[in-house]
């Protein structure tokens, strides 16, 4: 089971280590709000792809307000000069949701080498710049262990190196207990758009076992 399902979704729950990316309560309008959340994430991820966004957490404490927390490696790109970019984003979300109370919080990810989303995006960017996939994967593994990672697994799929036949290459270092629910495993994917086609990147990072002070929502 742990080998097949998404490592993040497998651990989502009030008593487990992972939390939901959307926090809201709606009886009749759940579908509408859910689609809105998807559009907001799409707007942020596509508009600020150079910022290397790790996570977008959307909270709706009431029917009149929305709080968006963005974790990114380069928060200055999202903020912009004198806050110009974040003001544009706020106005776009106000128009999309028809809410006047829109709050956006930007958080910098300091240990980005053990953040699966940022690591996957970094590998994808290197592949787009024609860096060897083996070099990109090995560099990511070494950097992860330097920042406290206890295990990492990286997979690249597609026409690697411009080969005629698509294949999958992967590397694994350290521990990766996918079946252990208390294991803090971060998982993410990314896509590299190359001249040979799309290359898919998957990253699993094991940060240690769950403890109460490590839990986040």
Swiss-Prot record:
Residues 40-110 form the KH type-2 domain. One of its GO terms (molecular function) is mRNA binding. CDD domains: KH-II_30S_S3. One of its GO terms (cellular component) is cytosolic small ribosomal subunit. It comes from the Bacteria. SUPFAM superfamilies: Prokaryotic type KH domain (KH-domain type II), Ribosomal protein S3 C-terminal domain. GO terms for biological process: translation. InterPro entries: KH_dom (IPR004087), KH_dom-like_a/b (IPR015946), KH_dom_type_2 (IPR004044), KH_sf_prok-type (IPR009019), Ribosomal_S3_C_sf (IPR036419), Ribosomal_uS3_bac-typ (IPR005704), Ribosomal_uS3_C (IPR001351), Ribosomal_uS3_CS (IPR018280). Keywords: Ribonucleoprotein, Ribosomal protein, RNA-binding, rRNA-binding. It holds the Pfam family KH_2. Belongs to the universal ribosomal protein uS3 family. Part of the 30S ribosomal subunit. Forms a tight complex with proteins S10 and S14. Binds the lower part of the 30S subunit head. Binds mRNA in the 70S ribosome, positioning it for translation. This is Small ribosomal subunit protein uS3. The lineage of its organism: Bacteria, Pseudomonadati, Pseudomonadota, Alphaproteobacteria, Rickettsiales. The gene is rpsC.
């Amino acid at each position: 089971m742990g080998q097949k399902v998404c490592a993040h979704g497998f651990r989502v729950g009030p008593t487990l280590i992972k939390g939901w990316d959307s926090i809201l309560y709606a009886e009749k309008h759940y579908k509408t709000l859910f689609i809105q959340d998807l559009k907001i994430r799409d707007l942020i991820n596509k508009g600020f792809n150079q910022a290397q966004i790790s996570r977008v957490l959307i909270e709706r404490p009431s029917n009149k307000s929305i709080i968006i927390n963005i974790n990114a490696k380069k928060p200055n790109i999202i903020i912009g000069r004198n806050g110009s970019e974040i003001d544009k984003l706020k106005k776009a979300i106000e128009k999309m949701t028809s809410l006047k109370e829109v709050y956006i919080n930007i958080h910098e990810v300091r240990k980005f080498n053990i953040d699966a989303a940022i690591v996957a995006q970094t590998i994808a960017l290197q592949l787009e710049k024609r860096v060897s996939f083996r070099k990109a994967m090995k560099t990511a593994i070494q950097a992860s262990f330097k920042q406290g990672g206890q295990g990492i697994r990286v997979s690249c799929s597609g026409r690697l190196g411009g080969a005629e036949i698509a294949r999958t290459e992967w590397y694994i270092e350290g521990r990766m207990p996918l079946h252990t629910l208390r294991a803090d495993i971060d998982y993410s994917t990314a896509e590299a758009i190359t001249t040979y086609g799309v290359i898919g990147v998957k990253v699993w990072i094991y940060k240690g076992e769950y403890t109460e002070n490590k839990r986040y929502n």
